[in-house]
């Protein structure tokens, strides 16, 4: 597939996610700010107790501590729970499908982008299309700083999660940590390089958004 085709599939994946998020949160969903702050606290403790560290880990902890206020007032809706290209299907005529709903939950819709790093590793154009397709217009200014908060939280727990599955999974997560560090240039920026690269490869003009 050409980068433009990959971007087009990303647009469809973003639209599908937006449609999922139009569904209401579960009635028993607890307040998001308190719930996710508790989750981040647990992940920071687990990372610091883990014998395996990765480059940039403490920068992620600092970013989390400095940006907790971004959670304030965030809405909640239905979540797929594991939305990335590994849980999508593609037919020969390029029809996109979404599978693996066994982790469905309620939460901030934008948290669903926390696994977009898998998409970016496979295709920057697809990942950029996912973002643009979700918003169908200019990307809100608040999105990328909050995206980094959610990605940082997810990455911190990745090594701890991988250890029981063996050395191969640990190495995969360490490589992902390196890719993350590169995408954010040592966490000195909030818009990841893959977003700009993906749009450029797909022939999109301008900076962020359509």
Where does each model-flagged region fall?
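Short, flexible helix/strand-to-coil boundary loops that buttress conserved ligand/catalytic motifs
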Residues: 1, 92, 102, 110, ...
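A cross-family kinase active-site recognition segment
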Residues: 1-55, 74-76, 105-106
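Short proline/glycine- and basic residue-enriched helix-capping loop/turn segments at helix->loop/beta transitions
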Residues: 60-62
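Active-site acidic catalytic loop and adjacent metal/ATP-binding pocket
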Residues: 64-113, 207-210
């Amino acid at each position: 597939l050409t980068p433009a085709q990959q971007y087009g599939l990303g647009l469809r994946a973003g639209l599908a996610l937006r449609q999922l998020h139009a569904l209401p949160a579960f009635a028993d969903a607890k307040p998001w700010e308190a719930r996710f702050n508790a989750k981040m606290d647990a992940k920071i403790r687990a990372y610091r107790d883990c014998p395996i560290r990765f480059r940039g880990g403490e920068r992620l902890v600092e970013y989390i501590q400095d940006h907790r206020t971004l959670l304030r007032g965030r809405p909640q809706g239905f979540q797929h729970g594991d939305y990335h290209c590994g849980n999508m299907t593609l037919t020969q005529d390029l029809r996109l499908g979404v599978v693996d709903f066994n982790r469905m939950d309620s939460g901030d819709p934008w948290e669903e982008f926390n696994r977009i790093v898998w998409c970016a590793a496979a295709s920057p154009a697809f990942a950029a299309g996912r973002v643009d397709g979700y918003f169908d217009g200019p990307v809100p200014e608040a999105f990328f700083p909050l995206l980094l908060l959610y990605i940082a939280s997810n990455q911190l727990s990745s090594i701890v999660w991988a250890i029981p599955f063996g050395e191969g999974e640990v190495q995969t997560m360490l490589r992902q940590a390196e890719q993350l560090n590169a995408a954010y240039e040592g966490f000195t920026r909030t818009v990841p390089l893959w977003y700009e690269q993906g749009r450029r490869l797909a022939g999109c003009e301008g900076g962020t958004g359509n």
